[in-house]
Amino acid sequence: VVGGDECDINEHPFLAFLYSHGYFCGLTLINQEWVLTAAHCDRRFMRIYL
């Protein structure tokens, strides 16, 4: 994350995972509309519903 800040360990306690085409990726729910995941989890035209 470029320009990001460190957060408290309890600030974002909710996790999710994504399974697509045989791959698992972890996600962190950072607010009601956004999840944060690693760059290698990017899949074009993917839609995520929570």
UniProtKB/Swiss-Prot annotation:
PROSITE patterns the UniProt entry points to: TRYPSIN_HIS
Activity profile over pH: Optimum pH is 6.0-10.5.
Thermal activity profile: Optimum temperature is 4-60 degrees Celsius.
Keyword tags: Blood coagulation cascade activating toxin, Complement system impairing toxin, Disulfide bond, Fibrinolytic toxin, Glycoprotein, Hemostasis impairing toxin, Hydrolase, Platelet aggregation activating toxin, Protease, Secreted, Serine protease, Toxin
Processing after translation: N-glycosylated.
Location(s), subcellular: Secreted
Single GO molecular function: toxin activity
Active site as annotated: 40 (charge relay system)
Subunit description: Monomer.
Protein name from the UniProt record: Thrombin-like enzyme BpirSP41
Origin species: Bothrops pirajai (Piraja's lancehead)
